[in-house]
Swiss-Prot record:
Database matches in Pfam families: peroxidase (PF00141)
Ranges that cross the membrane: none
Record: residues binding heme b: 267
Name of the protein described by the UniProt record: Catalase-peroxidase 1
Organism: Cellvibrio japonicus (strain Ueda107)
Site location (Transition state stabilizer): 95
NCBIfam families membership: cat_per_HPI, PRK15061.1
EC number(s) given by UniProt: 1.11.1.21
CDD domains named among the record's database cross-references: catalase_peroxidase_1, catalase_peroxidase_2
Superkingdom per UniProt: Bacteria
Length: 729
């Protein structure tokens, strides 16, 4: 007989009551530890479509016109569970698309419509995205019908396009190609506030000084897409709001004319909802009970739909005909005097001092009822700010011009984070090249393997060092951002302003190398771009360094890069791509509040690197002597220019200890003699101190992995060089 005491039966096996939410995480226990999660997100294991699925290939089999027809039919197919205002869902779908794209910020390229992230926290539950869950549910039958051929990300933007077209606007076009993600993004910093819609000046405020908005943020409050429609911190003052608008839209890569067009065009159709008490609404989607099935803000206390809907708390339409594309917004805004009032939900808004009944929009359910139109504080800024007023009057006097500017601005808003035109898919892609798409000329030459070998030989015989070739190729490619697919080596914009003058590109060294490449180019019998020469030069240098380490390897090189011109380059829009740090070259422009290793992690994520790829690249770049300015920090080798695993061997060798010599400065000292052997920075030390990174470093330090280190470095190097070669994907 078993004498062990009987176990309790029928009880929850998890004494804390939850499998996923209880207990402290490693980050809770060690909040200052380097968190590598941003490099481990979007793993293929979380993608239900599998490793072999190609969205681009699937999209090319999509009947795009059939989708557009279905979307157009949906616009007026009102559902009882969420009825359409005036029988037309256009305003709702436009707001959904606007808010999907409008989270983009140019500083780091993150946010935006490119991933379908509105389906996940925190965006799906932001106060500013209230009731957009209903819009996505209305789209579900269409998504279900077309399946894998049409991503949620593409569908949401296309729905916004078709909403405008169904109401009379000729849109500029549509490009598909946005691939869905399958869980929330971990790399996007939305702010450090601890509550939604926190006013400036409190804990974790995104503002400092007079009203300096923290980089890289664009929105003025946690949980808003852009500005507070009631005014700065909820206090109406159109001129103050205008300043917020100008800053926010500039950080979304929009100028004043585009800003007015987007504001007016967004409010030409649809309405705001605040005819009720927000206290009657249930929790947001992430906090809602399981029976709500992912829907939030559900009103179980009052009717809560149709004319009784509460979303932003602001109530009313902006124009007389809210389901028709016309010039009614400017007619209403400019031809009436406005006074402050509060909506039934208690939100600040503006109403006309007087208005003719026939100019009032009708009720969303009963056309015999006329309703008072509204303007938000942001709308009033379009009238009261002098520059915005000039643009508004121009648009009012020329409706065709307004429609054209808006259509182009809407296309830019919804496609800015899709990247260069080479990534666009579908029959509705506009033929015109736009400067914000960072166009690059198509090359008209090919190179054989013999041609490539000849180029490598010429470059190695040019007198340029391994370090110079590696650093130049790296600097050209490192600007790539997987967030909005900008930057990279294609186009060789490192030759042009502003990149040629960036401090991080070491202008003197850069001009020397470019001069040599220009000489090689002029002496060739075949056409080759400088962009290709820069990359093949890096490949030649890496091959030589590998040979010197005893490993014969060919660095794959795919020709086909063009050389962009100044006319194809918007210098101002490239300013946010300027590196102010690069841990791969052991450089920071100045002392920042953020630790250098955190900045390295951020750059690696933007470049699309995994943690092992980041590790092997740093170790290789150090021994190649590719540090900024020839710095010796982290160069743990006596064989500079040789692609050895010495960085990892010496990093993990207990014969040495590390001693601080400054805030970001260390000496490596021999334990037995006290002799200083090498110098280092935090970016070097972190590969020995962080437990995860050390595990990778130990792999590359092993005696049996010297060749593996070289091969892994080459693979990661080629990934960086080809990151913007969308034609190779």
């Amino acid at each position: 007989m078993d004498n062990n005491p009987p176990t309790s039966t029928g009880k929850c096996p998890f004494t804390h009551g939850s499998v996923t939410a209880s207990g402290k995480s490693n980050t809770d226990w060690w909040p200052n530890a380097l968190n590598l999660d941003i490099l481990h997100q979007h793993d293929r294991k979380t993608n239900p479509l599998g490793d072999d699925f190609s969205y681009a290939a699937a999209f090319k089999t999509l009947d795009l016109q059939a989708v557009k027809n279905d979307l157009k039919a949906l616009m007026t197919d009102s559902q009882d569970w969420w009825p359409a205002d005036w029988g037309h869902y256009g305003g709702l779908f436009i707001r959904m698309a606007w808010h999907s794209a409008g989270s983009y910020r140019i500083a780091d390229g993150r946010g935006g419509a490119g991933t379908g992230n509105q389906r996940f926290a925190p965006l799906n539950s932001w106060p500013d995205n209230g009731n957009l869950d209903k819009a996505r549910r209305l789209l579900w039958p269409i998504k279900k019908k077309y399946g894998n051929k049409l991503s949620w990300a593409d569908l949401m933007i296309l729905a916004g396009n078709m909403a405008y077209e169904s109401m009379g606007l000729k849109t500029f076009g549509f490009g598909g190609g946005r691939e869905d993600i399958w869980h929330p993004e971990k790399d996007v910093y939305w702010g450090s506030e601890k509550e939604w819609l926190a006013k400036s000046g409190g804990e974790g405020s995104r503002y400092s000084g007079e009203r300096d908005l923290e980089n890289p943020l664009a929105a003025v409050m946690m949980g808003l897409i852009y500005v507070n429609p009631e005014g700065v911190d909820g206090n109406p003052d159109p001129l103050r709001t205008a300043k917020d608008i100008r800053e926010t839209f500039a950080r979304m890569a929009m100028n004043d004319e585009e800003t007015v067009a987007l504001t007016a065009g967004g409010h030409t159709v649809g309405k705001a909802h605040g005819n009720g008490n927000a206290a009657n609404l249930g929790p947001d989607p992430e906090a809602a009970d399981v029976e709500e099935q992912g829907l939030g803000w559900v009103n179980h206390k009052t009717r809560g739909i149709g004319r009784d809907t509460v979303t932003s708390g602001i109530e009313g339409a902006w124009t007389t005909h809210p389901t028709k594309w016309d010039n009614g917004y400017f007619d209403m805004l400019l031809n009436h005097d406005w006074e402050l009032t509060k909506s039934p939900a208690g939100a600040w808004q503006w109403k006309p001092v007087s208005i003719k009944e026939e100019d009032m929009p009708v009720d969303v359910e009963d056309p015999s009822i006329r309703c008072t139109p509204l303007m938000t504080d942001a709308d009033m800024a379009m009238k009261m700010d002098p520059e915005y007023r000039k643009i508004s009057e121009r648009f009012y006097s020329d409706p065709a011009y307004f429609s054209e500017v808006f259509a182009r601005a809407w296309f830019k808003l919804t496609h800015r984070d899709l990247g260069p035109k080479a990534r666009y898919l579908g029959a509705d892609v506009p033929a015109e090249d736009l400067i914000w798409q960072d166009p690059v000329p198509t090359v008209d030459y090919t190179l054989s393997d013999a041609d490539i070998a000849d180029l490598k030989a010429k470059i190695l015989a040019s007198g340029l060092s391994v370090a110079e070739l590696v650093a130049t190729a790296w600097d050209s490619a490192r600007t790539f951002r997987g967030s909005d697919f900008r930057g990279g080596a294609n186009g060789a914009r490192i030759r042009l302003a502003p990149q040629k003058d960036w401090e991080g590109n070491e202008p003197a060294r850069l001009q020397k190398v470019l001069g040599v490449f220009a000489g090689i180019q002029s002496g060739l019998s075949k056409k080759v771009s400088i962009a290709d020469l820069i990359v093949v030069g890096g490949a030649a240098a890496v091959e030589k360094a590998a040979r010197d380490a005893g490993v014969n390897i060919t660095v794959p090189f795919a020709p086909g890069r063009g050389d962009a011109t100044d006319a194809q380059t918007d210098a101002e829009s490239f300013a946010p791509l300027e590196p102010v740090h690069d841990g791969f070259r052991n450089w920071v422009k100045k002392d920042y509040a953020v630790q250098p290793e955190e900045m390295l992690l951020d750059r690696a994520q933007l470049m699309g690197l995994t943690a092992p790829e980041m590790t092997v690249l740093v170790g290789g770049m150090r021994v190649l002597g590719a540090n900024y300015g020839g710095s010796k920090n982290g160069v743990f080798t006596d064989k500079v220019g040789v692609l050895s695993n010495d960085f990892f061997v010496n990093l993990t060798d207990m014969a040495y200890q590390w001693k601080p010599t400054g805030k970001n400065s260390y000496n490596i000292v021999e334990r037995n003699t006290g002799t200083v052997k090498w110098s280092a920075t935090r970016v070097d030390l972190v590969f020995g101190s962080n437990s995860i990174l050390r595990s990778y470093a130990e792999v590359y330090a092993q005696d049996d992995n010297r060749e593996k280190f070289v091969r892994d470095f080459v693979k990661a190097w080629v990934k960086v060089m080809n990151a913007d070669r969308f034609d190779l994907k």
